[in-house]
From Swiss-Prot:
Residues that span the membrane, as ranges: none
UniProt xrefs under InterPro entries: AAA+_ATPase (IPR003593), ATPase_AAA_core (IPR003959), Lon_bac/euk-typ (IPR004815), Lon_lid (IPR054594), Lon_proteolytic (IPR008269), Lon_Prtase (IPR027065), P-loop_NTPase (IPR027417), Ribosomal_Su5_D2-typ_SF (IPR020568)
Function (record text): ATP-dependent serine protease that mediates the selective degradation of mutant and abnormal proteins as well as certain short-lived regulatory proteins. Required for cellular homeostasis and for survival from DNA damage and developmental changes induced by stress. Degrades polypeptides processively to yield small peptide fragments that are 5 to 10 amino acids long. Binds to DNA in a double-stranded, site-specific manner.
Catalytic reactions of this protein: Hydrolysis of proteins in presence of ATP
Residues in Lon proteolytic domain copies: 797-979
One GO-annotated biological process of the protein: proteolysis
Positions of ATP binding: 560-567
Protein name: Lon protease
EC numbers, comma separated: 3.4.21.53
Cellular location(s): Cytoplasm
Length: 996
């Protein structure tokens, strides 16, 4: 049995739903899409009825406490007698309905959560009149299925039972009484009854006589022997002027509660009948009648009743039927002559007369009286507000005086955790003294504010943010360098140099901790196994050596193309040190307040990202990742980069100022790590405060190993597949990498593997049995679609005026074909196409100037540069290109075209050229070498100053490519052109030999 406020679960079975549509309505209401956040306000209610076990219940019960598993709701109704009903009942509210999948039955079930509201006592039952009213049948022995309704009273009240049953808000006892009183006061009720009686078949004469007789015989409204409900029902039946047969129907009902509900239904029926009558009326002017209808419907009682009717389709059908039935009778009354059109005209004239009289009385009211009424209402509202404020102020002053007399501290804070910490002499040290004082000051201000004041909400939010900050709370770090190395190796394949740099960086941090361990241990207070209180924080001691040494550790910045593992590497560092990990996305940030926070006086003000990150971590020494630090920008709202200078400067971040907090915060224990795609985009002052670690592109073999050792395992776990259901070899992975990805990292590769896994899962869910699934080059297009990247055809024969260059882009390295042709023209000079930007255009012009100056040496003959137009084109014109590293490639292509000497397509080059032919250093050599390796290039010319970068290139690339360092372009010319004749010379010599 459920008692008040107890909660229970109820399974809504298919049988329950078929018994009544009520449960179907509840399921639809509670499980509909509430994505807009709307809550169910009018929650459904049910009455739980209990029965006691007896001998004749063995069909449904195993014992007194256990039901048979096979027993159904229908079995209960068929086999439990009315005599077994318990007198106790519980009114419950349906709090929620949850949809749950049952693996056993392979079906969805609905589970309702019920909350008990009140206990009720069973008073009476009613049902089939022929069965229950029969004197020959013992009602007690009838099964429950004959019951159609029950009457119950709320438990625990000495008042009349019917009145307590009205505790159910849906009865709207007071609302009905108020509506009727208002309608009577405005004379609308009398007009409505005139019209209603006519519709029901009464002539104008009968209505006037009956109204007069009823008013004379109306009994006293109050009767001491009746309950309030009985008195209201008796009065309402008089106001409704019901005919005898309807009065008999109402008074024969088992209780006043049923009579009250019948009168409510009668009211709704009357209003809907009047509406239909007005719509069907052929008279020209129906404004007066519409006024009556509007008065009857302009109240919450009628609106709520109509909503309940619309929700219950059976009730809606019943009301429509009753309206049509009574209106049909009305037409028959007209045909039989019981009522006439003259009766209607007389009734309408009476209604108009009543409304005109009411209007005249209203217009004759004294203007000063109306003014006094308005003033009285305004004064009443003002006085009410003043009384409320004075009452609140008086209560606060009394509370303050009582606490002063009892000498009690104000511990009522609503934050039990904060109170517990502050009252503990040890844990209290987690908060600096000035912060505790500041919180107390703000709380004192809050006490003197009105709860409705906007400042009260601002102050409460400010206090809450101060409490949430960890202040001196730090977490215990793991200082095991071997563990750090194991975690990096486990989570990341390759990146040997990057890992070594990270290990060196961590070693420096760990060494500082170990050196100062003994001196700092005395300032550490243990909270638990994972957290401590560090008294060195927020300490007015500028000579804190440990802190200075720690601050001298540079901020690590990981720079590399997207998908190369920068974010995951930072997460691994946090895991290695057992630090909390907080990621702050700075991409697109252009407002300084996002870093420093807003002043608390602003509407909706909150702390900046740094303080929010510390609140999220819960400690003052987390690892904070500053993601995409190169993508911040400045505008009229300030420069966030300048704010980051204070955060990352070891000399300033011990006293970081957030505009919202208004207190200095020590960031010296925070381990900051930043990520960026291009260090060129990081402002110079910020770059000066960080140490750069570059993460370069992966080779195809590295991507294959990463996929096999890391990505495939993750894909299987996310898709719920077995290893045999996702078998992929190296060739298939290489095919995906070459034809479906164009990236430096492996992010796109992971997406494509996820897509394949989803295709396999779809096949399995669709009913296809797959124990083993092999992914190869043949079925990859079926799984991923048409290849997005097609390999360009490799030119096997040497070409004139076409040379392979190497470029470095955001997705890694790529080869760049440079083409040159020349012809006589009236517009001599150089024409550049292929969407070349300014620096690359200058590089091409420098190359042409160098070639013209050394044309004789390079074997360029019969070319008049003053009448020759030279066209330089870089294919893939839709892609912008820039940079000086194609200088030697431009030079080689120009010499090849002008001297008509072909260049091998297995040769590529990179380097900036000067007017004197010097070859200068370039960047991104590793990525460019990957591109050459991928295309099958055998020889690559590189600047002499880049020879040091060859150690960064994997051995497999160096074994396949011959790198030739050069300091001057003549060295390239000697390799490619020296001693070679042009195609024209060779053709002429062949002709001469043939002629001989």
């Amino acid at each position: 049995m459920l008692f008040d406020r107890e909660v229970a679960k109820l399974e809504i079975t298919d049988e329950l739903i078929t018994q009544t549509t009520y449960w179907k309505q509840i399921i639809d209401e509670y499980t509909k899409d509430n994505s807009n956040g709307a809550e169910i306000i009018n929650k459904a209610r049910i009455m739980l009825v209990y029965y006691r076990p007896a001998e004749d219940n063995r069909v449904i019960l195993e014992s007194e406490l256990q039901s048979k598993p096979t027993a159904t709701y229908a079995d209960v109704l068929e086999n439990v007698n009315i005599s077994n009903l318990d007198s106790n009942m519980t009114l419950c509210q349906v709090e929620s309905v949850e949809k749950v999948y049952d693996n056993g039955s392979q079906k969805w079930h609905y589970i309702a959560t019920l909350k008990a509201i009140h206990k009720y006592i069973l008073q009476d039952i009613y049902g089939d009149e022929e069965t229950i009213s029969s004197s020959s049948i013992d009602i007690e022995k009838l099964p429950l299925k004959y019951i159609e309704g029950m009457v119950a009273t709320r438990f625990g009240s000495e008042n009349n039972g019917d009145e307590m049953a009205l505790a159910d808000p849906s009865l709207d006892f007071n609302g009905f009484e108020e509506v009727i009183n208002t309608l009577i006061y405005d004379r609308n009720w009398n007009d409505a009854m005139l019209l209603y009686r006519y519709i029901r078949g009464y002539s104008a004469k009968e209505i006037r006589n009956w109204t007069k007789g009823t008013s004379e015989m109306m009994p006293d409204f109050i009767n001491d022997d009746e309950s309030r409900l009985e008195t209201l029902v008796r009065a309402l039946t008089g106001f409704f002027l019901l005919p005898p047969y309807e009065l008999f129907t109402i008074y024969s009902m088992p209780s006043a509660l049923h009579q009250f509900e019948a009168l409510k239904s009668n009211f709704v029926l009357m209003v809907r009948l009047i509406k239909k009558f007005i719509n069907e009326l052929n008279l020209g002017n129906t404004d007066k009648l519409l006024n009556i209808y509007n008065a009857l419907t302009d109240n919450e009682l009628f609106k709520n009743s109509m909503e309940q009717i619309k929700e219950n389709s059976e009730l809606e059908v019943q009301f429509n039927y009753e309206v049509e039935r009574i209106y049909k009778w009305h037409k028959e009354y007209l045909q039989l002559g019981y009522i006439t059109e003259d009766d209607l005209k007389l009734i309408i004239s009476l209604i108009e007369q009543n409304q005109n009289n009411l209007s005249k009385r209203s217009s004759k009211k004294d203007t000063s009286a109306m003014k006094d009424k308005i003033d009285k209402e305004l004064n009443k509202k003002i006085q009410s507000n003043l009384d409320k404020q004075q009452k609140e102020f008086l209560l606060r002053e009394k509370m303050k005086a009582i606490k002063e007399q009892l000498n009690e501290a104000d511990d009522e804070d609503g934050d039990d955790e904060y109170s517990k910490i502050v009252n503990d002499p040890v844990l209290k040290q987690m908060y600096p003294e000035w912060i505790i004082k500041a919180i107390k000051t703000e709380r004192d201000k809050l006490k003197n504010m009105m709860s409705s004041s906007p400042d009260a909400n601002i102050t409460q939010t400010y206090i809450s943010n101060l409490k949430k900050l960890p202040w001196r709370k730090v977490e215990v770090e793991n200082l095991d360098i071997n563990r750090a190395r194991e975690i990096l190796d486990k989570n990341h394949y390759g990146l040997k140099e990057v890992k070594e740099r990270v290990i060196e960086y961590l070693s420096l941090i760990i060494n500082h901790r170990n050196i100062n361990k003994e001196s700092s241990e005395k300032d550490l207070i243990k909270i638990d196994d994972h957290n401590q209180i560090d008294l060195q924080l927020f300490k007015e001691n500028t000579k804190n050596k440990a802190q200075k040494q720690f601050n001298n550790v540079p901020i690590l910045t990981l720079v590399g193309p997207p998908g190369t593992g920068k974010t995951s590497l930072a997460r691994s560092i946090a895991e290695a040190l057992d630090k909390s990990y907080v990621k702050l996305s700075l991409g697109g940030l252009h407002d300084e307040s996002e870093i420093r926070g807003h002043r608390k006086t602003y509407v909706g003000a909150m702390p900046g990202k740094i303080i929010k990150g510390l609140q999220s971590a819960g400690v003052s020494n987390p690892l904070i990742l500053l993601d995409e630090i190169d993508k911040m920008s400045s505008d009229i709202k300030g420069d966030p980069t300048s704010a980051m200078l204070e955060v990352l400067d070891p000399e300033q971040n011990t006293k970081f100022q957030d505009n919202y907090i208004e207190h200095e915060y020590d960031l010296s224990k925070v381990l900051f790590i930043a990520t960026a795609n291009y260090y060129e985009n990081i402002p110079a002052p910020l770059l000066d405060r960080v140490e750069i670690i570059e993460l370069n592109s992966y080779t195809i073999n590295e991507k294959i190993k990463i996929a096999k050792e890391h990505l495939v395992e993750v894909v299987l776990a996310q898709a719920g597949l077995k290893p045999d259901q996702f078998i992929i070899d190296d060739k298939a992975l290489e095919f995906i990498i070459k034809h479906y990805t164009a990236e430096a990292g492996v992010r796109s590769l992971k997406r494509n593997l996820d897509k394949i896994a989803r295709k396999i899962v779809t096949k399995i869910v669709s009913g296809e049995k797959i124990d083993k699934f092999v992914i190869d080059q043949n079925n990859i297009p079926e799984l991923l679609g048409t290849p997005k990247i097609s390999e360009s055809e490799k030119e096997m024969q040497p070409q004139i005026g076409s040379v392979n260059g190497l470029a470095f882009t955001s997705i890694g390295g790529t080869t760049l074909q440079i083409e040159v042709s020349w012809f006589k023209s009236k517009q001599p000079g150089i024409r550049l196409t292929g969407q070349l930007k300014e620096v690359m255009q200058e590089s091409a012009k420098i190359a042409l100037s160098y070639v013209r100056a050394n044309a004789e040496k390079f074997g360029i003959k019969n070319v008049d540069f003053d009448t020759t137009e030279i066209h330089v084109h870089v294919p893939e014109g839709a892609v912008p290109k820039d940079g000086p590293s194609a200088g030697v490639t431009f030079t080689t292509a120009l010499i090849s075209a002008l001297a008509k000497i072909p260049v091998s397509q297995e040769v590529a080059m990179t380097g900036e050229i000067t007017l004197r032919g010097k070859v200068l250093e370039i960047g991104g050599l590793k990525e460019k070498s990957f591109a050459a390796f991928k295309k099958g290039i055998k020889t690559v010319f590189i600047p002499k100053n880049n020879e040091k970068n060859l150690s960064d290139i994997p051995e497999e690339v160096k074994e396949a490519i011959n790198f030739i360092p050069v300091s001057h372009y003549e060295q390239i010319w000697e390799h490619l052109f020296k001693g070679k004749k042009s195609d024209e010379s060779e053709t002429e010599s062949k002709k001469k030999k043939q002629s001989k």
